[in-house]
Amino acid sequence: MICNERMVIYRGAGQRVAALEDFCPHRGAPLSLGSIQDGKLVCGYHGLVMDCDGRTASMPAQRVQAFPCIRAFPAQERHGFIWVWPGDAALADPALIPHLEWAENPAWAYGGGLYHIACDYRLMIDNLMDLTHETYVHASSIGQKEIDEAPVSTRVEGDRLITGRFMEGILAPPFWRAALRGNGLADDVPVDRWQICRFTPPSHVLIEVGVAHAGRGGYDAPADCKASSIVVDFITPETDTSIWYFWGMARSFRPEDNELTARIREGQGTIFAEDLEMLEQQQRNLLAWPERPLLKLNIDAGGVQSRRIIERLVSAERAAEAQLIGRQA
């Protein structure tokens, strides 16, 4: 399920990705229980055959010309991910899919995974756009007190939001000491650390993170004296209170080292599992006390601004849909 829509996603003719509503027009059986034959989706109940556009192609011993279409969702495969547009198909624009340089460039390595989390997708965005929680939720891996002490900058660029935090002359926490060693660098010397969070609506966050030996330029330090990566956070709402969370890390140092990729992935998976527990418990509290007011502090600027962007875009999309319906009436 994506955005409260039950979907079946599969590869049709020519391995092209297709997404249909998970509903057979014959008797309402889930098409996801079917099979793929000759690039078409075959219902596992009575053998009705569906095309990628939602039209019924055939059915054993039955004429199908008058069968109603089911909904087809625009879908594209790029950068190793499937991108589905769950809204009005007439408003789908593939140009809105962000370009991911690290996904197409062999100079980068990527490792990641998928978690199902029982929380509102906006809670995950809040979490990612304010990394002060690392000090407490991830104390044994990436957290340290200097995160709390570093000032945070926040700026809006159109529909995108960027927050940044820089720390100088600190000791690296355990995860980043291991990353320094992975790049063949000393891990017991002072470092400069950075966190730059970039929110792209509706629900994607890319975070530039890293450490460099102190005094070598920090974020702009030469590659041979730093360990840096891009934390990938693609959040797909499932329902109002659950998400599919695609997480990972892309790095440009030693991309050929598959063992290092596996170690980083394992460490990152453990870190994100800590977020999972916190977010699910937070969601339970919010459902139990929906009327209780919540505080907005200085550290919440990233989450607050990202929600404003989402609200503005939702309002604009609804207005566009209303205009389209008006023209069709």
Swiss-Prot record:
Reactions mediated catalytically: vanillate + NADH + O2 + H(+) = 3,4-dihydroxybenzoate + formaldehyde + NAD(+) + H2O
InterPro entries, sorted: Cholesterol_7-desaturase (IPR050584), Rieske_2Fe-2S (IPR017941), Rieske_2Fe-2S_sf (IPR036922), Ring-hydroxy_dOase_2Fe2S_BS (IPR015881), VanA_C_cat (IPR044043)
Membrane-spanning segments: none
EC number per UniProt: 1.14.13.82
Keyword field contains Iron: yes
Protein's UniProt keywords contain Iron: yes
Cofactor section: [2Fe-2S] cluster; Fe cation
Record note on cofactor: Binds 1 [2Fe-2S] cluster. Binds 1 Fe cation.
MF GO annotations: 2 iron, 2 sulfur cluster binding; iron ion binding; vanillate monooxygenase activity
Domain of life: Bacteria
Residues the entry annotates as binding [2Fe-2S] cluster: 24, 26, 43, 46
One BP annotation, GO: lignin catabolic process
Database matches in CDD domains: RHO_alpha_C_DMO-like
Segments forming domain Rieske: 1-84
Keyword set, alphabetical order: 2Fe-2S, Aromatic hydrocarbons catabolism, Iron, Iron-sulfur, Lignin degradation, Metal-binding, Monooxygenase, NAD, Oxidoreductase
Recorded metabolic or biological pathway in which this protein acts: Xenobiotic degradation; vanillyl-alcohol degradation
Entry similarity comment: Belongs to the bacterial ring-hydroxylating dioxygenase alpha subunit family.
Subunit structure: This demethylase system consists of two proteins: an oxygenase and an oxygenase reductase.
Protein name listed in UniProt: Vanillate O-demethylase oxygenase subunit
Species assigned in the record: Pseudomonas sp. (strain ATCC 19151)
Lineage, highest ranks first: Bacteria, Pseudomonadati, Pseudomonadota
